[in-house]
Amino acid sequence: MSAVKKRKIANKAPQYESDAESSSSHESVASKHSDNAEAQDGPESSETKPAPKSFKDLGIIDQLCEACATMGYKAPTPIQAESIPLALQDRDLIGLAETGSGKTAAFALPILQALMDKPQSFFGLVLAPTRELAFQISQSFEALGSTINVRCAVIVGGMDMVSQSIALGKKPHIIVATPGRLLDHLENTKGFSLRTLKYLVMDEADRLLDMDFGPLLDKILKILPRERRTFLFSATMSSKVESLQRASLSNPLRVSVSSNKYQTVSTLLQSYRFIPHKHKDIYLVYLLNEFVGQSAIIFTRTVHETQRISFLLRALGFGAIPLHGQLSQSSRLGALGKFRSRSRDILVATDVAARGLDIPSVDVVLNFDLPTDSKTYVHRVGRTARAGKSGVAISFVTQYDVEIWLRIEGALGKKLDEYDLEKDEVMVLAERVGEAQRQAIMEMKNFDEKKGTRAKKFGKGKRSRDEMDQEEG
């Protein structure tokens, strides 16, 4: 992957401009920062970690170590180094780590090693909050277990239940599922039982509970055998997650690789740019030209804006694809596949893409719309600068976003610099972007009409189990 393009960061206070371009002075973000030039880096984790070990040092057998090498895993990540030796001790485990920390291999490797020792069908079950994450976890299991011909089945909503029943009838070693569809099969698929299950993993447990899967998890836990090993992985330890671990784990060991709730990695270059709201599109196009040839995720707040920006960028010749919860399952998987393969290098997304998705090679994150909370900001920018690589995150701050931005900086524990660019260079693009905006408006009308037709056809009502494993954004 090419190195992220280096940019100079402005030390001067940003000049605010109103939508009306008036000459009256405005209070700047930098003036509220007070001593921006002397701002210190955010708090570091108080824990000191030893030098990374090899997977063999952790107790992983040679066959699986070779699979790790094939996948490009040079050394264990902190969560892997802490979790794997404990998981191999046949103990329940709670792992607290942020997105992009390598949690999947932290539970997949011990399960595969145990499977090699005592092969059987329905050996492990992994519960995930979203369909995309379920498919990615399955792919990781299959890649790491390729030398032992591990069989995985993905059981998620939005897919044909009959074909899933056939897949379960082939007795896979590992099932990766969303809770709603798994419970459907446990209740309705003849001959399907998990009474011999040995391992249960609840990945992104905080997200599972945020998406109201709690009652479904309770039902599933009552069906599963008590004599099993359970791994719970989460980015945070909320009261809901605490309750879940008490109900599902037996005398667990706990691993945490970060003591700072809002910590970001040191290889991530974060900045903001104050932008008049009406000029956001122009600045976005300018920055994409600055980072041409590099992969980028553009985060927006709504489905409508995600689609509009995708249409806008396509009209300008960019390879942009949307990702949000109102797309069909096949469209969402297709979008992720194109972005991973780099046939498209720009992903325009709601927060459906902020957590859990396996997109390892993102160079730039652009917060077109600021998130309303600091935790979501950290999850978004965590899509870049992963596994020791460098990355860039730039946030657009309009005259309406100043208070939100100051709250985010407060949570980070540091003041960020303004991204340096020349306004005159940006505004050269105004006419061209304006034409693309008009074209995008026409395409949005067609999109909204089709969406309205579907809404009338299917009606509105309480979410089904199938819909629950689809992100809201």
Swiss-Prot record:
InterPro entries linked to this entry: DDX47/Rrp3_DEADc, DEAD/DEAH_box_helicase_dom, DEAD_box_RNA_helicase, Helicase_ATP-bd, Helicase_C-like, P-loop_NTPase, RNA-helicase_DEAD-box_CS, RNA_helicase_DEAD_Q_motif
SMART domains from the UniProt entry: DEXDc (SM00487), HELICc (SM00490)
Catalytic activity, reaction form: ATP + H2O = ADP + phosphate + H(+)
Location of the Helicase C-terminal domain: 283-427
UniProt KW rRNA processing keyword: yes
UniProt-recorded name of the protein: ATP-dependent rRNA helicase rrp3
Function: ATP-dependent rRNA helicase required for pre-ribosomal RNA processing. Involved in the maturation of the 35S-pre-rRNA and to its cleavage to mature 18S rRNA.
Span of the signal peptide: none
Keywords carried by this UniProt record: ATP-binding, Helicase, Hydrolase, Nucleotide-binding, Nucleus, Ribosome biogenesis, RNA-binding, rRNA processing
Binding-site positions, ATP: 97-104
Gene Ontology terms: biological process: rRNA processing
Biased composition annotated in UniProt, kind: Basic residues: 1-10, 453-463
UniProt keyword Transmembrane present: no
Protein family: Belongs to the DEAD box helicase family. DDX47/RRP3 subfamily.
Predominant location category: nucleus
Pfam families in alphabetical order: DEAD (PF00270), Helicase_C (PF00271)
